[in-house]
């Protein structure tokens, strides 16, 4: 059967609250019901929009996610947070609505420029660092081949698995970002301010 497809341009403008409204209309016009499921394939912008829309469409429907960026694979795919921009304010609103299924395909990382791999590796380093010396030592060992540029998909998969296990600990300890999990937000406020100032 033909499945309806909604294409979303992965830009900060697409994450604006007003820009998400046509997505709700498109889902309705495509005939999605409460029992339907959204399958999101893409990076962080697509994930933010899919999380937000799936959480609100008909008061919430299931969704699954296939991250295509290293940052999405190593971090944001797990946790179920959405972040939506309002006016000049980045990530002002959002909610929690985790995907019911996540499929990580390391082959997508082969399509990414080195700067994208470095960005994902930096976030993975921060996650490991926040957990402690043992987790960070494991990160250093597993990340070395990826950072060298000479890596096999199995090596990337091992790094992703270790990173997501650490993040899972934070989520299970503090699902809604009230205590320990807030450590993972380290650097985000400054980073978002810098992005806004240089946009």
Tell me what each language-model feature is.
Residues 6-7, 57, 94-96, 171, ...:
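Short hydrophobic "helix-edge" motifs at membrane interfaces and signal-peptide entry regions
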Residues 45-52, 73-74, 192-193:
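Short glycine/serine/threonine-rich phosphate/pyrophosphate-binding segments
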Residues 52-145:
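A glycine/threonine-rich phosphate-anchoring loop and its flanking beta-alpha core
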Residues 1, 43-46:
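Short glycine-rich anion-binding loops that position phosphate/pyrophosphate groups of nucleotides
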Residues 24-41, 50-65:
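Non-catalytic interfacial helical region
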Residues 10-11, 41-43, 186-187:
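Glycine-rich beta-strand-to-loop/alpha-helix junction loops that act as flexible
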Residues 138, 142-199:
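Active-site segments that bind and position negatively charged phosphate/pyrophosphate groups
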Residues 1-37:
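ATP/NTP phosphate-donor binding region
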């Amino acid at each position: 059967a033909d499945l309806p497809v909604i294409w979303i341009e992965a830009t900060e403008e697409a994450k604006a609250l007003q820009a998400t409204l046509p997505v709700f209309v498109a889902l309705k016009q495509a005939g999605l019901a409460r029992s339907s499921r959204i399958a999101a394939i893409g990076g962080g912008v697509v994930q933010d929009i899919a999380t937000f829309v799936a959480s609100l469409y008909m008061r919430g429907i299931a969704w699954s996610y296939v991250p295509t960026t290293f940052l999405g694979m190593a971090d944001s795919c797990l946790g179920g947070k959405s972040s939506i921009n309002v006016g000049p304010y980045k990530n002002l609103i959002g909610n929690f609505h985790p995907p019911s299924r996540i499929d990580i395909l390391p082959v997508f990382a082969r399509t990414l420029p080195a700067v994208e791999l470095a960005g994902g590796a930096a976030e993975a380093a921060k996650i490991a660092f926040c957990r402690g010396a043992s987790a960070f030592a494991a990160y250093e060992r597993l990340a070395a081949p990826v950072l060298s540029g000479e890596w096999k998909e199995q090596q990337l998969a091992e790094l992703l698995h270790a990173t997501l296990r650490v993040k899972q600990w934070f989520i299970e300890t503090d699902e809604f970002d009230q205590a320990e999990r807030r450590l993972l937000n380290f650097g985000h406020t400054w980073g978002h301010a810098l992005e806004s100032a240089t946009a």
